[in-house]
């Protein structure tokens, strides 16, 4: 009788183990938003539409210098002192837009063989401001040796 109960308990636990889902969930929880919004320098920052994977402090400092070249954008960041031994920074920039209301969203998911970053570019609903903007999204993720794929 005890063997049957023990066997049922083992089977129950084995069927409820969702290690792959839990790993993905834990990886997604490791995504920390640093900043998202728009640059208002009409492209004067010199940042083209791109997806960046920043693994070194020097590259991060160079990006911050560019971002702050017109307006002090990094003042609104949740953090700028990144520990690159533990984290990688993901930065996505859209093209310069001729009006406001645009945004960029990221959905970052870790899988067993790669990290996938789904980039969604949103357009304004209805009327938008008549100012040139450049949407961006910057986040840090736990450092990994897995390849990073943008979609």
Write out the residue ranges for each language-model feature.
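Exposed, flexible binding/inhibitory loops of compact, secreted disulfide-stabilized domains
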Residues: 17-151
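Bacterial Sec-dependent N-terminal signal peptides
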Residues: 1-26
């Amino acid at each position: 009788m005890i063997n049957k109960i023990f066997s049922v308990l083992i089977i129950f636990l084995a069927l409820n183990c969702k290690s792959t889902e839990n790993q993905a969930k834990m990886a997604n929880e490791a995504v920390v938003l640093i900043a998202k919004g728009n640059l208002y320098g009409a492209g004067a920052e010199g940042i083209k539409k791109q997806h960046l994977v920043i693994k070194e402090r020097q590259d991060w400092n160079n990006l911050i210098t560019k971002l702050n070249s017109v307006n002090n954008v990094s003042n609104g960041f949740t953090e700028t002192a990144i520990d690159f031994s533990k984290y990688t920074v993901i930065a996505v920039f859209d093209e310069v837009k001729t009006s406001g209301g645009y945004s960029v969203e990221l959905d970052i998911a870790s899988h067993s063989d790669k990290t996938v970053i789904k980039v969604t570019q949103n357009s304004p609903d209805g009327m938008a401001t008549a100012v040139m903007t450049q949407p961006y999204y910057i986040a840090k993720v736990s450092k990994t040796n897995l390849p990073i794929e943008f979609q």
